[in-house]
């Protein structure tokens, strides 16, 4: 995979994480009355048309009997109209707006005003005024759009298919008439066997050529994985043949036995491959973390873990791939003294309850919290500035769990060897500046 592909995959993963986080926050929000507006505009729709609809809704809301609810709804509609004014046309992927007033856990009212362009086209139009935000259309954006190739091959022919999400597509079918194992007429057994093997060889070559035609674009595979299926040993022979494209051989994730050929075999192959299809991301995650562990086992010096060393690697431009547990709870604080002096500290959910960490030891002055942000979000917003790609991982695999428990859920693969111990001799930050204490994950 090229560096461009790596970057595109990293960017897509980060956008998915941002949407996932947004959905979580929106679903937790609740309001009084029906003052929470969910507005989703499809690509190609007209801003003027949506403005007209909001103006009509404003007129209707003016008749709400409850004064408190009426003012809340009118305020939310006005906020949505103001957000809409920021756009002269609907963005290429559509527009999602959430406006309203939510009630915090402390019972206080907090305004919510969000407008985003999704990372891929959203095919839903929605306007709802409720006591909650409606996020189902955003959730649909997170459904996998990975494509998987299927080759169903037996002695009667081959089918080339594609599966993307829940959509199956038959790309091409061929039929073949191979001689049976027994001879006919006066043909010698040896000559007949040679003829049969030649036709079989040509058949495998034809299927291999078509596989490259359908599943390779611009010299690289266009599918995330490839499944070979069939009722005889053709599928195994195809996958091991020298005629089968090496680039596609590396993409084979499963070989399955099916009772039929053609469309019925395609459907059966999809059913039998369900588990491996759902675990492709899981497999990619295991591979990435295993690579991280391998660097450590070989003591290459081309790895980092923990907040302090990872931030140093980023500052040096040495980090190639940043690996972050998506549920890491560490918070990044930007603090400022009345004198103007600033510093950054990182605290977990227990450490931030200690008021002493927000007080300067020398002067006794209290720090002002200028910025408070989950470190995961900070990485998502800033990883590009350091020339790194960002990979989110879970703790659901054995490797992922070990990465979170043993390495704090944060690490990286480096472009070149870095001696962090030597760097620390020259640069000893304040102990709070990169607070790298163990956390309860």
Curated annotation (Swiss-Prot):
Directs the termination of nascent peptide synthesis (translation) in response to the termination codons UAA, UAG and UGA. This is Eukaryotic peptide chain release factor subunit 1. Heterodimer of two subunits, one of which binds GTP. Keywords: Cytoplasm, Protein biosynthesis. The keyword Methyltransferase does not apply. Belongs to the eukaryotic release factor 1 family. GO terms for cellular component: cytosol; translation release factor complex. InterPro entries: eFR1_2_sf, eRF1_1_Pelota, eRF1_1_sf, eRF1_2, eRF1_3, Peptide_chain-rel_eRF1/aRF1, Ribosomal_eL30-like_sf. It is found in: Cytoplasm. Gene3D superfamilies: 3.30.1330.30, eRF1 domain 1, eRF1 domain 2. One of its GO terms (biological process) is cytoplasmic translational termination. NCBIfam families: aRF1_eRF1. It comes from the Eukaryota. One of its GO terms (molecular function) is sequence-specific mRNA binding.
């Amino acid at each position: 995979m090229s560096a461009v592909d790596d970057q595109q995959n990293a960017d897509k993963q980060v956008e998915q994480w941002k949407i996932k986080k947004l959905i979580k926050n929106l679903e937790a929000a609740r309001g009084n009355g029906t003052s929470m507006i969910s507005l989703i505009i499809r690509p190609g729709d007209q801003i003027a048309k949506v403005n007209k609809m909001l103006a009509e809704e404003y007129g209707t809301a003016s008749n709400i009997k409850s004064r408190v609810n009426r003012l809340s709804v009118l305020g939310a509609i006005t906020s949505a109209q103001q957000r809409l004014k920021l756009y002269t046309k609907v963005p290429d992927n559509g527009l999602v707006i959430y406006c309203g007033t939510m009630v915090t856990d402390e019972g206080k009212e907090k305004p919510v005003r969000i407008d985003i362009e999704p990372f891929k086209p959203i095919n839903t139009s929605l306007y709802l005024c409720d006591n909650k935000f409606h996020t189902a259309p955003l959730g649909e954006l997170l459904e996998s759009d990975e494509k998987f190739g299927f080759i169903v091959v037996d002695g009667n022919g081959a089918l080339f298919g594609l599966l993307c999400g829940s959509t199956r597509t038959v790309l091409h079918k061929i039929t073949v008439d191979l001689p049976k194992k027994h001879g006919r007429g006066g043909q010698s057994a040896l000559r007949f066997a040679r003829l049969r093997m030649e036709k079989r060889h040509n058949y495998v070559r034809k299927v291999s050529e078509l596989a490259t035609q359908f599943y390779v674009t611009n010299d690289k595979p266009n599918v995330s994985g490839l499944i070979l299926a069939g009722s005889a040993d053709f599928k195994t022979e195809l996958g091991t043949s020298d005629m089968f494209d090496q680039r596609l051989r590396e993409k084979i994730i499963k070989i399955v036995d099916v009772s039929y050929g053609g469309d019925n075999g395609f459907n059966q192959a999809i059913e039998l491959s369900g588990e491996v299809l759902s675990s492709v991301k899981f497999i990619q995650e295991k591979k990435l973390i295993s690579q991280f562990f391998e660097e450590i086992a070989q003591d290459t010096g081309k790895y980092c873990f923990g907040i302090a060393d990872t931030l140093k690697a980023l500052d040096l431009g040495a980090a190639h791939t940043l690996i972050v547990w998506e549920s890491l709870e560490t918070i990044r604080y930007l603090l400022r003294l009345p004198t103007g002096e600033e510093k950054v500290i990182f605290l977990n959910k227990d450490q931030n309850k200690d008021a002493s960490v927000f007080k300067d030891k020398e002067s006794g002055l209290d720090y002002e919290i200028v910025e408070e942000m989950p470190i995961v979000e900070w990485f998502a917003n800033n990883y590009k500035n350091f020339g790194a790609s960002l990979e989110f991982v879970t703790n659901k695999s054995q490797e992922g769990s070990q990465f979170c428990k043993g390495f704090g859920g944060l690490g990286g693969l480096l472009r070149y060897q870095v001696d962090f111990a030597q760097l620390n001799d020259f640069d000893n930050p304040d102990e709070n500046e990169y607070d790298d204490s163990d956390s309860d994950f």
